[in-house]
């Protein structure tokens, strides 16, 4: 079985308000799951709006990460309070935790991304970490979220750094899937690869404009945030596990074992992993296309203030066998 997309998607400037009639049909006792203090105001709005719909609303926050300690604690909250859905409102870790908890307890999940930093609001996948942010594994879930609310006004309040991170993460879709899946004889997978190529081209064209015009909510910005949060998720939905991870994300997972990950966003680390992946490709058979891709990506990544080297992530490869770990 393959879950390709959320059952219902609301997108645009008033997506949250438009979603409310559908949410109240789905749930009577939702749990709003969040984490960071920077998104408190938005979560409070979500809480008030649901209360005004006469729902019995509870709230809970992750203390650490999308980790088993937090998941177990929130599972207990859900069971003790007869919660019938989870509304995950936040970044990738919150969205992944909400999806995982809903999957474990067989209740609907509603994802409300509050930044464009990942496509986690779309996918039937959760990445599990230790409470210190070290990657453990990814878990394929039974289905994508029941409802995805991609409200541009919510996302517009996020720091521009989160958009830069989302661009780096989404760019990796093409470079990874073209390696892992290019020879697979599966029509859907091949179509996913082609979508990821168009996604890459759009981000190379609009990415820097969007980063500089976040508070204008113009066409470049709208196209880019939807590319990061929606189209990137569609690639994973259509391509499935065959379009998931090559060196860029594998390097990210290794780097989380070394550094204090709360200093860096997921896509910031993936971006460095992507450059290293392309460097490895360039070294193999003297691949000139990989070298050209590095030059092209370096221009954009510097415009987006993204780290481009392991050293910029605070790693000395000559200490503690760090190079071997990566």
Describe the role of every protein-language-model region:
Residues 2, 170, 286-326:
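C-terminal charged capping/lid subdomain of soluble metabolic enzymes
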Residues 16, 39-43, 93-99, 118-122, ...:
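Short glycine/serine/threonine-rich phosphate/pyrophosphate-binding segments
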Residues 8, 30-31, 84-87, 108-110, ...:
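Structural motif
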Residues 7, 103-195:
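A glycine/threonine-rich phosphate-anchoring loop and its flanking beta-alpha core
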Residues 185-299:
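Active-site segments that bind and position negatively charged phosphate/pyrophosphate groups
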Residues 78-101, 105-116:
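A short, small-residue-rich loop immediately preceding and capping a beta-strand
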Residues 1-85, 310:
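ATP/NTP phosphate-donor binding region
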